[in-house]
Design a protein with these regions (language model features):
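N-terminal amphipathic alpha-helix/helix-capping segment at the start of soluble metabolic enzymes
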Residues: 20-43
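Alpha/beta enzyme core
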Residues: 28-34, 50-70, 74, 82-96, ...
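Glycine-rich beta-to-alpha transition loops that act as phosphate-gripper elements at the mouths
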Residues: 47, 101-107, 228-239
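Short gly/pro/ser/thr-enriched loop/turn and capping motifs at secondary-structure boundaries
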Residues: 75-77, 130-132, 259-264
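N-terminal pre-domain/capping segments
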Residues: 43-47, 51
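Active-site proximal loops enriched in glycine and acidic residues that flank catalytic Cys/His/Asp
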Residues: 199, 233-235, 257
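Short, Lys/Arg-enriched N-terminal segments with co-localized hydrophobic residues
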Residues: 2-23
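C-terminal alpha-helical cap/extension of soluble enzyme domains
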Residues: 238-307
Length: 307
């Protein structure tokens, strides 16, 4: 892979992502550090439509809580990345609270670079399906470039059976747990700012009550020197599971599937109640309101100090 660093350096000088500055578009460094000090986690909420973005920002502003606004390749058919990215960046800049514009599950170095060029303040490179050594190599490359932009990088080690569209998969959780020894070397050689780990959560809808190996969090946290850890597959867990994970070192929780279901149910009820006098934009308002309500609910779980 050939990368033109002269072009990248010019673009880096144009980027200005503050860890804790006056602008509201920030990278993850400051908000994760604050979460660690406060013993809470920040939420990562996906932008699959304008309504999901507007609802999440409104929730953040009403509660005064920072969050991560994310776009994943799995949402491409709902809202193409080239369309979503400028909207997400503008939403973050205009917000009254700190917002991270973040690429979720970037599945190639090229996509991560594209996100940075489009103004994202953070990217996730997901090389969890790659051989371990190749995951290290490509993640380190993304970190080198992203840090020159002033952006942060989340990576993933270990894997989860997943489909971000919410489809079900058979799985054996123990097969996917993150290994602490591999995590220690991975973090040291890549320079990542946050690490998504696997300890029993899954993307999408749980087929049965989840069995979470909280001890894995303890072991990985110890091995990686208290690096901020990330939990994917946050939908469908009980409040106690969230708080247990956070108490052990989870500092970012990704949440999408059950929020999308909640918004869908709200729209279904609205359509049923307004038969014969329905306009499309009314559905959009209903969906935005439902997203806002559910995001606020999750934000309060992740940080019990939030009123």
């Amino acid at each position: 892979m050939t990368i033109c660093y002269n072009t990248i350096n010019k673009q880096c000088r144009q980027a200005n992502f503050s860890a804790n500055g006056d602008i509201m578009l920030v990278n993850m460094k400051g908000v994760l550090a604050d979460a660690a000090k406060g013993g809470y986690a920040i939420g990562g909420f996906n932008f699959a439509s304008l309504e999901s973005g507007l609802g999440a920002v409104r929730a953040s502003e009403e509660l005064g809580v920072p969050f991560v606004l994310e776009h994943a390749p799995a949402h491409e058919e709902y809202c193409p990345f080239e369309v979503a990215a400028p909207i997400m960046v503008q939403l973050a800049k205009a917000a009254k609270t700190q917002v991270v514009a973040h690429l979720d599950h970037g599945d190639s170095v090229e996509l991560c670079l594209k996100a940075l060029r489009l103004g994202f303040s953070s990217v996730m490179f997901d090389g969890s399906a790659l051989p371990y050594e190749e995951n290290i190599r490509q993640t380190a490359l993304v970190c080198k470039v992203a840090h020159e932009f002033g952006a942060t990088v989340e990576a993933e080690l270990g894997a989860m059976p997943h489909n971000l569209k919410g489809e079900l998969r058979e799985y054996t959780p123990e097969d996917f747990y993150t290994r602490p020894d591999e995590a220690a070397r991975f973090v040291a050689e890549t320079g990542v700012d946050a690490l998504a780990i696997s300890f029993g959560t899954v993307h999408g809808v749980y087929k049965a009550e989840p069995r979470l190996a909280f001890g894995v969090i303890d072991e990985v946290r110890k091995a990686t020197g208290d690096l901020p850890l990330v939990m994917h597959g946050g939908s469908g867990l009980c409040d106690a599971d969230y708080r247990q994970a956070i108490s052990r070192g989870i500092r970012k929780v990704n949440y999408y599937t059950y929020g999308a279901i909640a918004a869908g149910e709200a729209v279904r009820e609205y359509v049923a109640d307004h038969a014969g006098k329905l306009m499309f934009h009314d559905i959009a308002v209903c969906a935005t309101d439902a997203v806002c309500a559910d995001v606020k609910r999750v934000m309060r779980i992740l940080n019990p100090e939030v009123s």
